[in-house]
Amino acid sequence: RPAVIFGHTDLVDADEKYIGPRRLSPPEHLSWKSFKHGMLVCHQAFFAHKDLFRTTAYDMKYRFSADFDWCIRILKKGDAKKMGTHHAQCIISDYLNEGMTTQNHKKSLLERFRIMWRHYGGFSTIGHHLWFFVRKP
């Protein structure tokens, strides 16, 4: 029984017209450590096992990146229970290209930095953010 079933996400515009696949793709094997590399799986394409879902609420102190923190915490709990993950190998969701996080990009990045610091520590977080800066198109 997997802790999480996850898949791919396509981007759409406000009229629900297809734009293309998301720039970040989910890895074949997803773990809480995978999120060091960014939000690799949209929460819309991330289905937590019901036992984990029921006991893991969004942390509402995060206005724009609560999903990022939630996914990491779900995966950590699944890891502690020796539950794996399952890549569905298909497109599970469409995602609005200009959503709330995009409209509040700087605030979202600051929240995400704080979340990563909490879960991965300072050295790793700073190193990965330097990589995010380099990889950005």
Go through each PLM region and give its residues.
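A short coil-to-beta-strand element that immediately follows conserved catalytic motifs
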Residues: V4-I5, H86-A88, S124-H128
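Conserved nucleotide-sugar donor-binding catalytic segment
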Residues: G7, G20-E111, I115
